[in-house]
């Protein structure tokens, strides 16, 4: 398939630049993967769509304030976007400035250039940066970093984004983009689901800035995915096995949860073993033709045209079903992308 097969026209006004006043106030487009049937509704309808015995799998990564501003010690402004925390004092980052810094270049980061760091090495398009102080990287980021809003939101981050560009169940810091399907859940709706007999499990996938990189080839088979770190614990494996045994569904909240679960499944298939814990980097690329091993239903936002995420949705719901759903979403003026509305999709099995 060609990347252009996943194109759709999106009016600029449908890109959500701010979240709704309440997390659960978004709309929800339901898509039945087998029949192609579409239903417009509200996000709170999800309480009727999940059933006792289902397992919801969330990504509990925490978005770090990964964007820093500063200058080279020799002069010249720069912007640093952390891609990955390497250890307590070092990061891998994208650096934007007029001239790329060479190894050994000293950087002064923060509004008042209060934190000194050294550009240690370059790895392709990323720079390894080491802070010289005894403070831990995550503490420095909390002090001087800005929330790394996606480029299409097209505005500076605000104080409210520290809360709203973060799930209510976030736990493990490391992401530089939110697992956005989870943004629709507040504590009240989670409690209602639990009361209904729905079970929860948590994976971790630290979403990288690569998630916003465009696909730069024409044929999707030539695309190479960026790498992200994922964790699927034994506790999650046990919950999945118990759910399948009782006839429940594994409902993935977000594409990052899908990629975590299916990475574990693919690893097990290659090893010739049962589903097992997975703690590793993943470059899994899911596109039409992929056979899902774990996930039965999916909660997800509306994704960018020609992105790997709309390809994943097409693999799950069927290509034609997905493109029709997106056409309906545009016609019915759903809000798109990170702060936008959501879909609830059941897997195409036939």
Swiss-Prot record:
PANTHER family recorded: S-ADENOSYLMETHIONINE:TRNA RIBOSYLTRANSFERASE-ISOMERASE
- Enzyme Commission code(s) on record: 2.4.99.17
Q: What GO biological process, any one, is recorded here?
A: tRNA wobble guanine modification
Its source organism is: Aliivibrio fischeri (strain ATCC 700601 / ES114) (Vibrio fischeri)
The upper taxonomy is: Bacteria, Pseudomonadati, Pseudomonadota, Gammaproteobacteria, Vibrionales
The entry's protein name is: S-adenosylmethionine:tRNA ribosyltransferase-isomerase
State the reactions this protein catalyses.
7-aminomethyl-7-carbaguanosine(34) in tRNA + S-adenosyl-L-methionine = epoxyqueuosine(34) in tRNA + adenine + L-methionine + 2 H(+)
Q: How does it assemble?
A: Monomer.
* Role summary: Transfers and isomerizes the ribose moiety from AdoMet to the 7-aminomethyl group of 7-deazaguanine (preQ1-tRNA) to give epoxyqueuosine (oQ-tRNA).
Q: Which HAMAP family match?
A: QueA
- Give the gene name: queA
């Amino acid at each position: 398939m060609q990347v252009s097969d996943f194109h759709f026209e999106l009016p600029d006004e449908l890109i959500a630049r701010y979240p709704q006043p309440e997390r659960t106030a978004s709309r929800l487009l339901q898509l039945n993967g087998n029949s192609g049937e579409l239903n417009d509704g509200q996000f709170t309808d999800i309480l009727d769509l999940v059933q006792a015995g289902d397992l919801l799998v969330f990504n509990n990564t925490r978005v770090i304030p990964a964007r820093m501003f500063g200058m080279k010690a020799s002069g010249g402004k720069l912007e640093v976007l952390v891609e990955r925390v390497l250890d307590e004092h070092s990061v891998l980052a994208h650096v934007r400035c007029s001239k790329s810094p060479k190894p050994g270049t000293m950087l002064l980061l923060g509004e008042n250039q209060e934190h000194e760091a050294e550009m240690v090495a370059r790895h392709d398009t990323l720079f390894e940066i080491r802070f010289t102080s005894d403070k831990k990287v995550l503490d420095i980021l909390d002090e001087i970093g800005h929330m790394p809003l996606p480029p299409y939101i097209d505005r500076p981050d605000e104080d409210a984004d520290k809360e709203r560009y973060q799930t209510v169940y976030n736990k493990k810091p490391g992401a530089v983009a939110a697992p956005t399907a989870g943004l629709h859940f507040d504590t009240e709706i989670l409690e209602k689901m639990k009361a209904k007999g729905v079970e929860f499990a948590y994976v971790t996938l630290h979403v990288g800035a690569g998630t916003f990189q465009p696909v730069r080839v024409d044929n999707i088979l030539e695309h190479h995915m960026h790498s992200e770190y994922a964790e699927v614990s034994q506790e999650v494996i046990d919950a999945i096995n118990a759910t399948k045994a009782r006839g429940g569904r594994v409902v993935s909240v977000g594409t990052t949860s899908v990629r975590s679960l299916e990475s574990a499944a693919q690893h097990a298939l290659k090893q010739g073993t049962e589903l097992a814990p997975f703690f590793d980097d993943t470059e899994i690329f899911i596109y039409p033709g992929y056979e899902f091993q774990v996930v039965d239903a999916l909660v997800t936002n509306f994704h960018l045209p020609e992105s790997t995420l709309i390809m994943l949705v097409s693999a799950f719901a069927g290509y034609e079903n997905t493109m029709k759903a997106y056409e309906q979403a545009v016609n019915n003026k759903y809000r798109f992308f990170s702060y936008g509305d959501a879909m609830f999709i059941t897997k195409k099995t036939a």
